[in-house]
């Protein structure tokens, strides 16, 4: 998985480097698919290795630090692009070549300087879905649906309803990254302190308020504040990953990470198309649908135990899909 992660990053960087050389529709389709394959395979393996390598009591804070580092890199990239294109006047072709080339060099350096870390357990080499992970699958699906409301329609609202320019939206992105840089590690520590159940309940209640407010807001500054808060809630999704880490068999992590990405993207493919039709006739209704998604997530989150473990995956077991009698890890909590 470690080698595959680096190969995926290299593939993404190659796609970025080639983008400037294909400034036409079919060419951009091909380079975007190449970048997307590299990105999505890397993110899947990244989640898998993080959950395997990092101890359960350290994982929330570590994932918060990961988000902070990603935000720092995004801010650095924004600043570099602005400086190189506005002050030095470099072309799109050179910009893409430079970004992809630097990324590829970094991947090679990482390949050379990091040792091959040992795997704590042998991972399944095939796709699997377990009945006792049903709650995690459900949370993952609605998380994908919620992400599309933010990525597609909240941004579109800022432009269409409030007349935000490219520069205004870019500034909002930078504020989002700055907030993540500051608060994501703190959110990770907070999740470790209060537990996955309370963290996700707070997130989904907050999202219901944000989505309903999107539908009602008339002030562009309040809308911008909602946009930043909405993005900050993404950091609380750390709790979903640590919930999986606590309930999953160690050898299931890699396969379950792949399955969860697939489930997440079922919503990512379907939701924008369906709600795009709704947007044409009633944009506010899109955000009420988003609030409904958040409500479904909230109802699911109430079924997370206070101390989830293998054998104690859910609070109520109406469908007999979880809490199977299983050997309990002597190093873990009893799940009471």
Tell where the protein language model's regions lie, with residue ranges.
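Helix-to-loop junctions at the C-terminal end of transmembrane segments
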Residues: 1, 85, 183-195, 279-280
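Cytoplasmic membrane-interface "Motif A"-like loop-to-helix N-cap segments
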Residues: 1-9, 193-204
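Cytoplasmic helix-loop-helix junction between adjacent transmembrane helices
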Residues: 33-70
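Glycine-rich segments within core transmembrane alpha-helices of 12-TM secondary carriers
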Residues: 63-79, 263-271
């Amino acid at each position: 998985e470690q080698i595959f992660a680096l190969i995926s990053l290299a593939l993404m960087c190659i796609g970025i480097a080639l983008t400037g050389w294909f400034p036409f529709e079919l060419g951009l389709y091909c380079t975007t698919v190449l970048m997307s394959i590299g990105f999505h395979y890397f993110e899947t393996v990244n989640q898998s290795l993080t959950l395997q390598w990092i101890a359960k009591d350290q994982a929330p804070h570590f994932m918060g630090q990961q988000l902070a580092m990603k935000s720092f890199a995004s801010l650095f990239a924004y600043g570099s692009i602005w400086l190189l294109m506005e002050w030095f006047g470099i072309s799109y072709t050179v910009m893409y070549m430079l970004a992809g080339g630097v990324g590829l060099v970094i991947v090679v350096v990482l390949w050379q300087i990091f040792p091959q870390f040992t795997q704590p357990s042998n991972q399944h080499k095939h796709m699997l879905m377990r009945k006792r992970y049903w709650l995690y699958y459900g949370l993952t699906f609605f998380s994908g649906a919620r992400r599309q409301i933010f990525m597609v329609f909240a941004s579109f609202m800022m432009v269409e309803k409030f007349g935000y320019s490219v520069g205004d939206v870019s500034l909002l992105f930078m504020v989002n990254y700055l907030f993540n840089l500051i608060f994501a590690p703190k959110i990770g520590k907070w999740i470790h302190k209060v537990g996955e159940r309370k963290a996700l309940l707070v997130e989904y209640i907050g999202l219901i308020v944000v989505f309903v407010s999107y539908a009602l807001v008339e002030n562009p500054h309040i809308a911008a504040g909602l946009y930043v808060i909405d993005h900050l809630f993404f950091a609380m999704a750390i709790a979903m990953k640590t919930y999986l880490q606590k309930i999953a068999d160690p050898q299931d992590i890699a396969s379950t990470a792949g399955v969860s990405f697939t489930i997440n993207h079922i919503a990512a493919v379907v939701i924008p198309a369906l709600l795009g039709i709704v947007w044409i006739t009633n944009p506010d209704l899109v955000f009420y649908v988003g609030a409904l998604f958040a409500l479904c997530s909230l109802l699911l989150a109430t079924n997370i135990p206070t101390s989830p473990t293998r054998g104690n995956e859910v609070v109520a077991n109406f469908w007999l899909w979880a809490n199977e009698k299983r050997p309990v890890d002597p190093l873990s909590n009893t799940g009471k």
